[in-house]
């Protein structure tokens, strides 16, 4: 199995970051644009490229769709849209993550599972969301805008639980742009309602899931930006080569608490 060599940089590091928990900030205190302005950019992009459903070997999920904010110029499937690269693949078996195996992949480098391969921001994305993306201090890797079309859905008692990459490798910033009271995040035996106007960061190496607390009666989709940052790495944008940055090894909890992820 061929992996991205960037993984070697993290050998011997603390990938659990167990002191890193749940954090929330207002967009204003982070110096970020308003949710309304970000949503305007998202809608402009949607009008130009459309939305792409989550795809696996066994099914296509139309109720969960969106578009990628980053892409891999060397992606293994040349026919797949650059905007759908982070929306699964017909080679993967499971709904989330790599914890249950690689599916039909013969290599992980330059596949859906290659987090560090998603090193480029498309011109259309930059045109309409550059004012937002440029406000972050770290390189942007695997990132997406995610829509959940949950109207009529009932709560799922046990589905959707997953873990993501270690936060020292990919630190996710979750920003709700459009939501309603039915939608929540469950993490560490707690339930959180994410509010428009805030940004959330939590330890995604711990099991968590998006879900509903009751039948969804809101017809408009839930829309979140899920931005993945590389807090310990610098990126050469021309060559897509990563190197350790000056914060390499600094606890993620301190990076977030000190707001070092924004300019």
Language model features by range: what are they?
Residues 179-263:
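Catalytic core of Fe(II)/2-oxoglutarate
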Residues 104-121, 167-174, 249-261:
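Short N-terminal helix-initiation segments at or just after the protein's N-terminus
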Residues 20, 170, 220-222:
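A general secondary-structure signal for short beta-strands and their flanking turns/coil
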Residues 1-135:
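Non-heme Fe(II)/2-oxoglutarate
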Residues 23-25, 143, 173, 208, ...:
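A broad, low-specificity signal marking well-ordered, structured residues that form hydrophobic/aromatic
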Residues 126-203:
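Catalytic core of non-heme Fe(II) oxygenases with the double-stranded beta-helix
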